[in-house]
């Protein structure tokens, strides 16, 4: 901790800027508010899979690089999350077996967070690829 944050406790939040990429002014206001609240760390990427991989095998990390750079400039540390909290639409359409199965034997519908089958080999492989 001494080398990373000068011995200070982490004071932060989950941050999901991928929701506002078309509105850079929202990020700038968020950054201003984070600084005003003395935020020194954020978790990024928890629900960003559909933006990081909009199509199977097609990746876009440019926005994430840009956000990380701006946070770094503002002396805000970044904790990268595994972006499996929300699956992209293409994944559930192509591989419906990644969806959780309820007690009545029916699969959950897509659109919820943390809604994947933890034992699905396909899901595990797709998370590793990402």
Residue ranges and their predicted role:
Residues 22, 58-63, 118, 122, ...:
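Alpha-helix N-cap and loop-to-helix initiation/capping positions
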Residues 4-8, 41-45, 105-111:
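Short amphipathic alpha-helical segments, especially helix-boundary/capping motifs
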Residues 1-23:
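Boundary/entry segment of secreted carbohydrate-active catalytic domains
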Residues 16-18, 53-55, 117-118:
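Short, contiguous strand/loop micro-motifs
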Residues 20-36, 127-130:
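Short, acidic/polar
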Residues 85-130:
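Active-site-adjacent "subsite" loops/lids of carbohydrate-active enzymes
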